[in-house]
Amino acid sequence: MTNEKCRVLVHEDLGSGYRRIVFDAPAIAAASAPGQFVHVRVPGLEMSALRRPFSIFNAEDGKLELLYKRVGRGTAVLNELAVGAEASVLGPLGHGFPEACDGVPLLVGGGYGVAPFYFLSRRLMAAGHKPVLFVGGRTSTDLLALDRFASLDVEVRTATNDGSAGTKGLVTDPLDKMLAELRTRGERFELFACGPDPMLKAVAMRATGTGAKGWISMDRHMVCGVGACYACIQKTVRGNSRCCIEGPVFAAEDLVW
């Protein structure tokens, strides 16, 4: 874990309130793994003891890339951070996704829950795997970074509630179709998920119900980010766990819903 003063290299609008920011962060980028997160303190909030947590979208060549949505005071201030400005970034933090996979990696993201899967896809592909990404949202503008996954040649299947892109319905609809295809062919698979709780529970149930491994990134309100305050508790079969230390990624079989 490093507290690094990082300069903004890129900060751009993705539409519908979503943004992409890239920091020059050589120490953090070198130590980061898929599924981990960073805590950012932005100019204008220096009087606050609290940082804001963000999933790592990518870490490569000394650069740290994040996706976020403007939803509160912290992200509103971050939204105004110009190229060339600096912010204090603490990380990498948390327990991420495993990068070894027994079978076909099926990545399931809801909205900006897709954030950790670009980095994970890169690592899985480097290990010889061919991940399949399932992305869901209310409408087509909630499907983020599809061009980036296309640049990796990742197979992407989409779903939207309003039918404006991909399958009309839930992201678990195309997922279920893929699971049926894999079972018919006798192929093994592992599930990886990040997004809203109902989706996470649905994916976890599919993992435990089929005997497959499942890895679930839980989204909980974080305060300190380093395990001291116990604000980000997740119930597991072993008792209460901290999302910032034991998580945010947990084995599906360990979660209590």
Which residues fall in each region the model found?
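Ferredoxin-reductase
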Residues: T2-V83
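Structural signal for conserved beta-strand scaffold positions within catalytic alpha/beta enzyme cores
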Residues: V10, N58, T158-T160, I216, ...
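Short, Lys/Arg- and Gly-enriched loop/turn segments at beta-strand edges
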Residues: L45-F54, G94-C101, C244
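FNR/FR-type flavoprotein reductase catalytic core
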Residues: R73-I216
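Local cysteine-cluster metal-coordination motifs and their immediate loop/turn environment
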Residues: D197-P198, D219-P248
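Short microdomains enriched in Cys/His and/or Lys/Arg
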Residues: I245-W257
